[in-house]
Amino acid sequence: MSQLTDGFGRSFPYLRLSLTEACNFRCSYCLPDGYQVDGRPRFLQVDEIARLVRAFAALGMSKIRLTGGEPSLRKDLDEIIATVAAAPGIRKVAITTNGTLLPRRLPGWHRAGLTALNVSMDSLQRERFRTITGHDRLPEIEQGLALAQALGLPAIKLNAVLLRGLNDDELPQWMDYLRDRPFSVRFIELMRTGDNEAYFQRHHLRADVVIEQLLAAGWHERPRAADAGPAREFGHPDHRGSIGIIAPYSRDFCKGCNRLRVTAKGDLRLCLFGEFGVPLRPLLQRDDDHDALLARITTQLGLKAAGHGLHQGQTGLTPHLASIGG
């Protein structure tokens, strides 16, 4: 088994695979007007996903994260998870979801082979959550998290986008929340995309502000593993949970890049904010194209840039995060 590496010595054991661009939320930082259907989109089907995952696994990838849009909107998600989990070499199957369907569907995903769960949870306060997401669904999400614990899922993470003036005063509440819960909360610095320039200027908060508050409250940064991603992890001896900071505008953010992305329509994206996508779908129709698919992936990886260009105001092809799943 080979190992995917780029020209800057970074290795890539991790694929983020979008299953759909559709989403049932209207998050103010992503899709404030809701998902707008463009014609009749045809997203990757199970047989195409199987060929795609087998190829990346053959190149050394061991972790697949299923994203959206909102991946739980796929009626065939149980089958997709089982297909991904069955691929030789895949050891971890994760999903990022808004969590509203967890109470109904999580047991099926778990039986199919799901090993890790990320839930978007931008506020612990119900009214604020409704304001940010456009939906009053926090109770269902909390019920789903309790179910995930009961099922024994070994990795449960919560994602919260930092929003100045909307949720930036909740850190003490989050600390209290993590005192007895073994979750990892990821605070994500708001990123500029093609559709959110005015929103970004109004609500962007540098992650350094949160890091300073964590250190002042007695939290300590944990050593970063050699194969870790870009998150900086913090722990506290009096808390079961941990806090991660994802700061795309930090100087060394891209040094820790360890993931590639494939869109719901089958385009390989070397970077969340890249200027181009590489069509893989034509090589996902037949098993006989496996070697050609491997060659296309490895060749294109040689074109991956050292950084994302956000400091220069570049947002690439990404109109909003729902289009590629973050």
UniProtKB/Swiss-Prot annotation:
Chain sites annotated for binding [4Fe-4S] cluster 1: C23, C27, C30
Annotated InterPro entries: Aldolase_TIM, Elp3/MiaA/NifB-like_rSAM, MoaA, MoaA_NifB_PqqE_Fe-S-bd_CS, MoaA_twitch, MoCo_biosynth_MoaA/MoaC, rSAM
Cited CDD domains: Radical_SAM, Twitch_MoaA
Assigned protein family: Belongs to the radical SAM superfamily. MoaA family.
NCBIfam families: moaA (TIGR02666)
Organism for this UniProt entry: Stenotrophomonas maltophilia (strain R551-3)
Keyword GTP-binding found: yes
HAMAP family given in the database record: MoaA_B
Domain (Radical SAM core): residue spans on this chain: 7-232
A single GO molecular function term of this UniProt record: S-adenosyl-L-methionine binding
Positions that bind GTP: R16, R65, T96, K157, R259, L260, R261
UniProt-recorded name of the protein: GTP 3',8-cyclase
EC numbers on record: 4.1.99.22
Cofactor: [4Fe-4S] cluster
Residues engaged in binding [4Fe-4S] cluster 2: C254, C257, C271
Entry function: Catalyzes the cyclization of GTP to (8S)-3',8-cyclo-7,8-dihydroguanosine 5'-triphosphate.
Binding locations of S-adenosyl-L-methionine: Y29, G69, S120, M191
Pathway linked to the protein: Cofactor biosynthesis; molybdopterin biosynthesis
Catalytically driven reaction(s): GTP + AH2 + S-adenosyl-L-methionine = (8S)-3',8-cyclo-7,8-dihydroguanosine 5'-triphosphate + 5'-deoxyadenosine + L-methionine + A + H(+)
GO biological process: Mo-molybdopterin cofactor biosynthetic process
Family annotation (PANTHER family): GTP 3',8-CYCLASE (PTHR22960:SF28), MOLYBDOPTERIN COFACTOR SYNTHESIS PROTEIN A (PTHR22960)
Entry keywords, A to Z: 4Fe-4S, GTP-binding, Iron, Iron-sulfur, Lyase, Metal-binding, Molybdenum cofactor biosynthesis, Nucleotide-binding, S-adenosyl-L-methionine
Subunit structure: Monomer and homodimer.
